[in-house]
Amino acid sequence: MSLGGIVDAILGKDDRPKVKGRVILMKKNVLDFINIGASVVDGISDLLGQKVSIQLISGSVNYDGLEGKLSNPAYLESWLTDITPITAGESTFSVTFDWDRDEFGVPGAFIIKNLHLNEFFLKSLTLEDVPNYGKIHFVCNSWVYPAFRYKSDRIFFANQAYLPSETPQPLRKYRENELVALRGDGTGKLEEWDRVYDYACYNDLGEPDKGEEYARPILGGSSEYPYPRRGRTGREPTKADPNCESRNPLPMSLDIYVPRDERFGHVKKSDFLTSSLKSSLQTLLPAFKALCDNTPNEFNSFADVLNLYEGGIKLPEGPWLKAITDNISSEILKDILQTDGQGLLKYPTPQVIQGDKTAWRTDEEFGREMLAGSNPVLISRLQEFPPKSKLDPTIYGNQNSTITTEHVQDKLNGLTVNEAIKSNRLFILNHHDIVMPLLRKINMSANTKAYASRTLLFLQDDRTLKPLAIELSLPHPDGDQFGTVSKVYTPADQGVEGSIWQFAKAYVAVNDMGIHQLISHWLNTHAVIEPFVVATNRHLSVLHPIHKLLHPHFRNTMNINALARETLTYDGGFETSLFPAKYSMEMSAAAYKDWVFPEQALPADLLKRGVAVEDLSSPHGIRLLILDYPYAVDGLEIWAAIKSWVTEYCKFYYKSDETVEKDTELQAWWKELREEGHGDKKDEAWWPKLQTRQELRDCCTIIIWIASALHAALHFGLYSYAGYLPNRPTLSCNLMPEPGSVEYEELKTNPDKVFLKTFVPQLQSLLEISIFEVSSRHASDEVYLGQRDSIEWTKDKEPLVAFERFGKMLSDIENRIMIMNSHKSWKNRSGPVNVPYTLLFPTSEEGLTGKGIPNSVSI
């Protein structure tokens, strides 16, 4: 430095060019209501010189021929004087970079080092006026822990997307090293500051150390129990079975490892409370049990059930109530469970009974919910009569249906069965084959007595579905090889026969709720998406355009899945309230055997189920055979919008099929996704090769569809329909009342009590309703389809304009949904219960709304 420069430095003069930056972050005390002193401690560290530094990395000038040139460190200014209230959100800090007189070029990334003692959530860095360039924006959205926690530097890249081959040379090594850090080395227990994405089987569903009764099969890694992989945690193995992973004690269940950036990042406290409650619901069990002990384990009338919503029920005084008030905050009790904090439990009235308390019992509503309810993805067209089973007859004997022409002929509006089949008027809700293989073991439980069901329906002239017959089957008492013992029930509305028909429909609903929760919802959205989350972070750099496309659709998925494993799907969790009981996850593994990735596309699914046929003259290339099928009608519009958006996006970055084929990150991603993430399916011929732009478009469209619209359609109607459990019971405690039994005689005098005793046990009902109500809520910071959490998510203008078009398409779909819902001619859109179909309405407000399509499987 010259003498003049030394003098200037002493006098505080510095004529070197400066570049101003603006950093937006959230301090730990904003997002951690327990450790509210974190910001003060970090302020003291800052005062003592332990600051937060940033070094820019040139994206155009090499330092040593390989890596981009580094700027001198610059430090966040005024940390100590920035006093952020607990309720506040973002904090903004200035940072000033000395601009080297030598050519630095254009910054393409930066290294940040946190020398404080606590982590913070870094949202973005914006360089306001880079010489010869202008503004540069870095989207970060990541937790930055103290530097000593990391084995490598924390690096963030500017919001310019690059294919691997197009990455500027100075950034390539940084890009590669970041992916290496995210992959980890596959060893050791992972801690909260680790950023490692890796795979594991579902080997943490049981607790074999507590005894054989608490053991559960390992899902994944075998032909008997194939399953998608989950994120690895590296917890210690159990003592009883070294192949099983130990579990956290319940109070620590929120601490299960997921990469820190995958954890909930809610800003609003009530959203945090709701998330916490997902792991605290087990605390309610003792109080619920006490309540049920005081008023033995059943409701006596439908008025008792309605009182849960209209008046509330008093939880008994004692240690149980104290356990609730000690372990669950008053905000949760008041805002989420709607108690008064003094033990009065009250739930919001579900939509299905808001307008009419009894319309749910009608046959029309029973059929309508197969098209517009919470599980509208199972109904299929009947193509052979009687229905035949696909179960192996050498193992299970004759499993074909016993429904005959005589059961249905007089209900077909003058058509014969063959004529009804040929005219596409017969449909089936078929639970038989997925339930029957486990039913003998399920029914050995003291609390569960279920059937395997088939339901036949007729499509009427007004486009509603009329149930014709319900077949309920049990395993043959002499052994599986002897087939089934089946009985067929037909509609009736008076006397004991009418009550029996209501029972038959309820047994169908029990099957449907179990399959809905375990297969349609959990397996086919939550579980199958997690390997995509892991593979994307391991192999697609944040610079990669496909990472930028898919990343919003993975928000919070690993975290909610980890919570589900800890509190819902494990032994003693949610399975206690579903009819398959301890065999719940085993049933979902059986269903995964038939999972086919290309068939998750909505048009392919509708064709497979026979509810649509190919028709190139139709808007979506297929024609629905049930014109008033709200899920399919709205779903096809959403599907087409997603496909259009993905097509435009992919064409911008991939100019030819060769570009797809030679994308090293993309090919590594797809290879590992097939061979590791969905490793039990790796040899299936149906996997796309991902060699063309069309294959890339189709795969990304399916991924986004599953994570957004499919999940929304299957999840956010849960409380609307199943919040009133008589409509969608999850358990059946007894078999059908038979003539001569006490229950059959009681049907003559008090059929409602027998129904409730069979299908709505108090303890399980209270737990179920609590779970449904909490999990059906939208957070205040939810990001919906067609939205991004940052408007500057990419620098490329063409994708931004295409994304605006996507948002406009979704807005138009909202308007069409509202118009169709207002037309009474579309009977299935509201039905006898007058609940408009809004589950595929793209946007929503906060809370319990029964509408809205979040970008991701986030709850």
From Swiss-Prot:
Chief subcellular location: cytoplasm
Compositional bias of kind Basic and acidic residues: 233-244
Keywords: Cytoplasm, Dioxygenase, Fatty acid biosynthesis, Fatty acid metabolism, Iron, Lipid biosynthesis, Lipid metabolism, Metal-binding, Oxidoreductase, Oxylipin biosynthesis
Domain PLAT stretches: 34-158
GO cellular component: cytoplasm
Protein's UniProt keywords contain DNA damage: no
Keyword Iron: yes
EC number(s) given by UniProt: 1.13.11.58
GO BP terms: fatty acid biosynthetic process; lipid oxidation; oxylipin biosynthetic process
Binding-site positions, Fe cation: H521, H526, H711, I859
PANTHER family: LIPOXYGENASE
Similarity comment: family membership: Belongs to the lipoxygenase family.
Designated name of the protein: Linoleate 9S-lipoxygenase B
Native species: Solanum lycopersicum
